[in-house]
A protein has these predicted regions:
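Structural motif
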Residues: 102-108
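Short N-proximal segments of mature Sec-exported proteins
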Residues: 109-123
Length: 178
């Protein structure tokens, strides 16, 4: 019985501490601190979102992916034992490169860069093997009603993957600017 009491006491203390912390550290409007991610620049939001969902690729089983999901290209000499600082630097360089590639899309360039980091820019822009995506076609036609097209990049081997769908929705919420 004493273990149950101890558990209930710890649970109550945790709840009180959480409520106290939210009141003490919330913003002027009373919103929770988690919303402070929206105060970051879009590129930083994209990087943090990518790190969260991609996870750390620090083992040999992840090869040819290292760091926060960077695919090692021919001529690169990265290994799986890079530091997190090196992984962060590689991710930022990759995202900046993709932002430059999609810069003609203005405020949507970060959203497209985040998606292209995972699916590859050729899946969006098209290549000899892939047609141009409907997402890019809509943006080129200056139609920014792209939610459905963005979320459509949620399949693996033709099947919808719920975790990828959740990721797309979070990316859209964090990075789409009206």
């Amino acid at each position: 019985m004493s273990q149950v009491r101890m558990f209930v006491i710890i649970l109550l203390v945790s709840a009180v501490a959480t409520v106290y912390g939210q009141e003490r550290h919330g913003t002027e409007t009373g919103t929770a601190p988690q919303l402070s991610i929206y105060k970051l620049p879009p590129l930083e939001r994209a990087i943090r979102c990518t790190k969260y969902y991609e996870g750390w690729h620090g083992e040999k089983k992840h090869w040819p992916y290292v760091g926060w999901g960077h695919k090692v290209l021919p001529g690169e000499s990265f290994t799986n034992d890079i530091t997190k600082a090196q992984g962060d630097s590689i991710l930022r360089a990759d995202m900046m490169k993709l932002c430059r590639l999609f810069s003609r899309f203005g405020r949507d360039s970060t959203l497209l860069s985040c998606l292209a980091y995972q699916v590859g820019p050729y899946r969006l822009l098209g290549s000899k093997d892939f047609p141009k995506s409907k997402l890019i076609q809509k943006l080129e036609a200056e139609n920014r009603d792209i939610y459905k097209e963005y979320i459509s990049f949620r399949c693996y081997k033709g099947k919808v993957v719920p975790s990828i769908e959740r990721r797309r929705k979070v990316e859209y919420l964090l990075l789409f600017e009206e």
